[in-house]
Amino acid sequence: MNIPKSHPRFVSLSIREKIVKGYNDGLVAKEGLLAHGRGEAFDYLVGEKTSKTAKAAIMAAAVKLLSAQNPVISVNGNVAALCPKEVVQLAKATQAKIEVNLFYYDEVRKKKIEKSLKKAGAKQVLGTNPRSYRKIGDLDSPRRIVDKDGIFAADVVLVPLEDGDRTE
């Protein structure tokens, strides 16, 4: 869709189009469309601005990533659809590994996400080789399946766009 730059919600609509494209390309689960809509509604309610609290959290996360010995960036379908190049740039800047980790588990979708991240410049993407899988005992969701060299061994994990079970 060609969204006019003059539209008052140009940025939001452009992001929405990336999510839809990600769904059509097999990166985003249909439930990911709903999750994005929920986040978009919340963003609208807070005035589509980054709060001071969020800015402080971003800075704290950056410090944690930079001081970690084994940082990992966890990527789901929505993240892969919205900002694969930025994930790769952040991983390079922080010496972090990248791992695909999904709630709506699908090996085919994992491979598509891996391909998208590699196209964006990632040299290595963890979380797609069943021989490297381990389970985190305290989680009941499919997100408990992680890579032995990634999230399983990490001292810091950045989980963008998270709404629950892994970040408590």
Where in this protein do the model-derived segments appear?
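Electropositive, gly/pro-rich neighborhoods at or near active sites that engage anionic ligands
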Residues: 1-97, 107-109
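Active-site glycine-rich loop that binds ribose-phosphate moieties when present
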Residues: 131-152, 156-167
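Charge-biased, low-complexity intrinsically disordered regions
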Residues: 1-21, 87, 116-125, 129-130, ...
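Long, charge-dense
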Residues: 93-144
